[in-house]
Amino acid sequence: MTIAIPFDNSYARLPGGFYTAQAPQPVRAPRLVAFNADLARLLGIAPGEVEEMAQVFAGNAVPQGAEPLAQLYSGHQFGNYNPQLGDGRAILLGEVLGSDGIRRDIQLKGAGRTPYSRGGDGRAWLGPVLREYVVSEAMAALGIPTTRALAAVETGETVRRESALPGAVLTRVAQSHLRVGTFQVFAARGEIAHLKRLTDYAIARHYPDAQGPMGLLAAVRDAQARLIARWMGVGFIHGVMNTDNSSIAGETIDYGPCAFMDTYHPDTVYSSIDRYGRYAYSNQPDIAVWNLAQLATALIQQAEDKEAVVEEATEIVHAMPELLERAWLEVFAAKIGIARPGEGDKALVSELLTRMAREQADFTNTFRALGAPRARDQFTDPTAYDSWAEDWRQRLTQEATPEAVIRAANPAFIPRNHRIEQMITAAVEGDYTLFERLNTVLARPYADQPDHIDLTRPPSASEIVPATFCGT
């Protein structure tokens, strides 16, 4: 085997109760459809022949040094606790230390049944695999912490969902797959030794300066506050912010029914399973606080003096809304050209958003257009913009380089939902042209790319995607 992956597997050295050793299940006729060469270089992976990479990234050939396993976790799903979830379709091959010194997991998603599959087939179909590949790489290019996509492979098999669909496997890369739910499962079971071991492991891996469980809680809080603010700044809606999808490392993980807003409205929901809007765009900061409270509840279980720790944990959690608001304001102030927000700037941003919602303005294009004299064109009634812009321009007289700040904070290109659906439809028919084009264009989201201006346009009435689906 010529492909070389320099594994160093710390999670596999934890006690067996953290995971189950599980080899991927081979597939019939793997075909490599995407390989992220830049990410491979960062990870120190020496690629092999295309045929060989197809075998490895489909799970047919386990590379030397891998210790494949499925991780155990539980979690709150739409507010209801599920005591055992775990990797039902994913296999962690192992970890590598990148050239940047960061340890990362390499995981095969859609690699077959595990002890945690709960009756599922352990497989994924092509659509969600390509969606996660495109969207996660777009998020990375936007500068938002995220899992990454190393490879996508067609399996040559069909999976049965609403109909027979082409199977696929995604190779996902993450700083870890530790979730809030990883802590919850041991706390709920009263396995305090495992909970302490997990806490020490998470601190050593992600936050070496954190002091004990409450230091870890504060570090996760800060990372999540920064992350959610960045989501809000690009109109990203995760769609399924369960605690098992909340990353301890502060990365976006488990894209499922994710979407980007076209027309701005704070209550926007795309996920077909989010029937009551729990994870709507505007609710995401509050849900992040709720998820942090569940992590706090789990971490507290290892304390000897629980009363004192409860008080400290409460203070840490209660500080998160203010941190979120501060991070949100920094993000949105930059979007209107303000490098260091001050008094009155929140009201200025909020008033623009109110008018955008009322006038059904496109979220991405409106903010991008603030750097050019065309933002008023995004409003059905341009005078709604004009009256706000008077106050805004007056505020910008205090800024040195507002145009540069606007361009750096506002992408021209995002993975618009209708383009993702068009890409999937074409790929199922064997045409990867749009998939490849999206990956190329979205790698430079802040650059003007005149040849691809069509990818900045909102959907027509017939192209609107009203709902998104997990679909894996």
From Swiss-Prot:
This is Protein nucleotidyltransferase YdiU. Its EC number is 2.7.7.-, 2.7.7.108. Belongs to the SELO family. Mg(2+) binds at residues 245, 254. The gene is ydiU. GO terms for molecular function: AMPylase activity; ATP binding; magnesium ion binding. The lineage of its organism: Bacteria, Pseudomonadati, Pseudomonadota, Alphaproteobacteria, Rhodobacterales. It catalyses: L-seryl-[protein] + ATP = 3-O-(5'-adenylyl)-L-seryl-[protein] + diphosphate; L-threonyl-[protein] + ATP = 3-O-(5'-adenylyl)-L-threonyl-[protein] + diphosphate; L-tyrosyl-[protein] + ATP = O-(5'-adenylyl)-L-tyrosyl-[protein] + diphosphate; L-histidyl-[protein] + UTP = N(tele)-(5'-uridylyl)-L-histidyl-[protein] + diphosphate. Keywords: ATP-binding, Magnesium, Manganese, Metal-binding, Nucleotide-binding, Nucleotidyltransferase, Transferase. Its cofactor is Mg(2+); Mn(2+). Coiled coil: none annotated. Pfam families: SelO (PF02696). The keyword RNA-binding does not apply. It comes from Ruegeria pomeroyi (strain ATCC 700808 / DSM 15171 / DSS-3) (Silicibacter pomeroyi).
